[in-house]
């Protein structure tokens, strides 16, 4: 969901039959349906996230999969069968149609969240590739061409109960409102990371904390057993407080963290050092959704009613 002046665009993953690529819903300021936003989807096979920079007349969209593919759960073989995305799409924002595709290949398996810098003059942006556990940096060159590079690569980790090393599963990324820090999660590993992106070509790791995950490094946080891993997160506008939740998608939760059915999810708060870099879990904050009156419940994402780091575009 993103603002469009006084209006709203919402991305969809598929149609009523669960078939990709979906498209974009255009709402007016009263939340009444205007219609489809896009004039054409071109040959885009999948949809997921999007972000735009009006001053560059560009929108970038990413790919997950068709609802019929991901809703039953995750099957690694379907990645090889090309049922999951590996591309970013460049749009002509004014014409509302895709004009270019960046093929990421093995470096960009399941590219999910897309973020441009908040500076409206900047052409620099990032995408987190969930299965590859990489961060892709893209920008417009001086010649006016869109370029991309892999700037962060999270190594897979061995696990005694897994036949293959565990990928991080980077399901989200976030850029602070001042464009100084990029945050990422590794949902299966169990860590949150902070990178200084003052030089977007060379992010510098400045902070890391653990919560839940399959590696067993922080199974309990503030007295609560974390069944899940860091998944979605929201940063305060001053960049000092981050709220992290643990549920990705119910069937995927049940597949990788079956205890979440009975334990529920949790919200953890991280204190972020905006001057020198660094992260630490706030010891005085925890929300245990397993103890909800009608629970156990799961928590997916936190948003601010007046706008936040993941919705506001200038």
Give short role names for the model-derived ranges.
Residues 1-54:
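Asp-box/WD-like beta-propeller blade repeats and closely related beta-sheet repeat scaffolds
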